Regions:
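Conserved catalytic alpha/beta core of Sir2/sirtuin-type deacylases, generalized to analogous enzyme cores
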Residues: 1-306
Length: 306
């Protein structure tokens, strides 16, 4: 209730962070003869069917760790990654939490900074000019070198890759072939190459010092910094959802630091098992140790927008 009361104030700027670590994107774990979703947060039959054949042929047991698997050929590498990208970037989130979050902040002066790379915020209708995806975008390729700081839309290529493996795409849903298993390789002619230097392309994901920060990335970073700069000292809610300690220096630590430096700011954290704050700002912190979906759903029942 205290968090909802703050969100419903008329004089509030809201900085909203969302980092779902496998909570709402189909990060599926396969075990025994049943589908067991990673951390038990969602049932995603479509995602599970999308990698069942890979599970049978490799040690891969969930989609995230599969991203680090050393596939034998580029054709096999892109067979896996095309499915991963399509499921996590181009399919809708399996729960309406993004839509509910938008309803909570739509009439506020908000900004979203996220380390998610699935663009669920944008698909839910959040203002693109109020979003900063710090770690990249599943929907973009970049040069693996990189020879430039450009990125390239990949939806057409990714769709061609999954269809070449036998999947069908209808109404945004990826469906495995009904007669047999998918082909665990893509045609060589579909392998993406940099249009400038010819080197292999890779995903635009921040995993090393070769991450390409294109013009769009820098424009979003500047808008975020301007948002913070022009609201300095105002009533702010730093709402942190699902952030762990994998990369706390990007969002968690700055949110805590900015709350400590602004006596009019409130820090709110919803996190299963990791809701914590600094001792110096305990009186201006709201900590909810619980499932984000359940908390947002409860707020939805009470909020005036329902």
């Amino acid at each position: 209730e205290p968090l909802l009361e703050i969100l419903q104030r008329d004089d509030l700027a809201v900085t909203l962070l969302l980092f779902f670590s496998g909570l709402f994107t189909p990060c599926v774990r396969i075990s025994a003869d049943f589908l067991q979703v990673q951390d038990a947060y969602l049932q995603s039959e479509t995602a599970a069917k999308g990698i069942t054949d890979i599970v049978d042929l490799t040690p891969i047991r969930d989609m995230y760790s599969g991203g680090f698997y050393p596939f034998a050929t580029p054709e096999e590498h892109w067979a896996y990654w095309s499915r991963y990208i399509y499921i996590n970037r181009y399919m809708d989130a399996p729960k309406p939490v993004y839509d509910d979050l938008l309803k909570l902040v739509a009439d506020k002066d908000y900004f979203v900074i996220t380390t998610n790379i699935d663009h669920c915020f944008q698909k839910a209708g959040f203002d693109k000019k109020r979003l900063f995806y710090t770690q990249g975008d599943y929907g973009l390729f970049q040069c693996s070198e990189p020879c430039c700081q450009e990125t390239f839309d990949n939806e057409k290529t990714v769709r061609a890759m999954v269809e070449a493996q036998g999947f069908t795409v209808a109404d945004g849903v990826l469906t495995p072939p009904t007669d047999g298993t998918p082909t665990m390789a893509v045609p060589s002619e579909l392998l993406p190459g940099c249009p400038h230097c010819g080197r292999p392309m890779t995903m635009n994901l921040r995993c090393d010092d070769k991450f390409a920060e294109d013009e769009g990335w820098h424009a979003a970073a500047e808008r975020y910094e301007n948002f913070l700069r022009t609201r300095d000292g105002q009533k702010l809610l730093f709402l942190e959802l699902g952030v762990g300690y994998n990369t706390p220096v990007i969002i968690k630590y700055p949110f805590l630091r900015m709350t400590a430096g602004n006596p009019k700011a409130t820090y709110a954290c919803i996190n299963m098992g990791q809701a914590s704050t600094l001792r110096e700002i305990e009186e201006r912190s709201i900590l909810i140790d619980g499932d984000i979906t359940a908390v947002i759903e409860e707020m939805k029942k009470t909020a005036s927008y329902k």
